Amino acid sequence: MIFWRAIAAAALLTVTPALLAGEIPPEARRSGYSFMGSETRAMQDDDTSNPGMLFVLDGEALWGRKTGGADKSCADCHGDARTSMKGVAARYPAFDKPLSRPVTLDQRINLCRADHQQAAPLPYESRDLLALSAFVAHQSRGVAITAGDAPELKPFVAQGRDLFMQREGQLNLACANCHDDNFDKRLAGAPITQAQPTGYPLYRLEWQTLGSLERRLRSCVTGVRAQAFDYGSPELVALELYLMSRARGLPMETPAVRP
């Protein structure tokens, strides 16, 4: 599948001028939801049909479960997530003062596990980490994204933007080639969106499971036949931060559904 998408991407860019449109102005930015077909939108809108909600329910159970050497649950510190976590995911990645760098929501969950629960970190893309992340992010559904506002984040946002604009891989393509210049077209039968990460972690029909934004970014990098960054790498965190800051003002949708 990745091979054929790479071929399709190369074909698309041979007939379409690259990097002519420039960055999408804020007033023209749209969630990927608006590019979806009616069946996909209906699946996302109905919580009883949205498969991502199964992960949210798992995350709710994990929220109240004591773990680690401290024998503490998330709820012991944060109480009712419906109030304490409302708006939190809309701010992430956020700046961590002790680390002097931004951290993603997944990384924050693992930092909390280490610092307050004395528990081992959950592996990236593990069901438990995705479930907790989905549960926390779900509390912000409908809340406008505000990520990237802190002054300390400015150089990291700039780093993410540079990565988004940078050509790479054997196909010599940048993220911007597809998502700034060619959105609203199709690639290998799927709609090209603006890459506004409003609903992560989201349920991707191709994956048949929930996945993080980092998984999606790694897939795109592999698609242009470049070496994917490691999960949790500074590059992926910077890209996620830039994309979330670029989506400021759009409402959170977690768990979104995409093809």
Give each language-model segment a name.
Residues 84-87, 185-189:
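Short Cys/His-rich "knuckle" micro-motifs
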Residues 45-76:
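N-terminal, post-signal-peptide region of Sec/Tat-exported proteins
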Residues 231:
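Cys-dependent condensing catalytic cores that perform Claisen condensation/acyl-transfer
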Residues 2-13, 17-55, 83, 93-158, ...:
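Post-cleavage N-terminal segment of exported redox proteins
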Residues 89-98, 191-200:
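Short cysteine/histidine-rich metal-coordination sites, predominantly Zn2+-binding motifs
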Residues 63, 163-164:
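Conserved short C-terminal alpha-helix that flanks the catalytic cleft of nucleotide-sugar-dependent
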Residues 70-82, 132, 160, 170-182, ...:
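The canonical Cys-X-X-Cys-His
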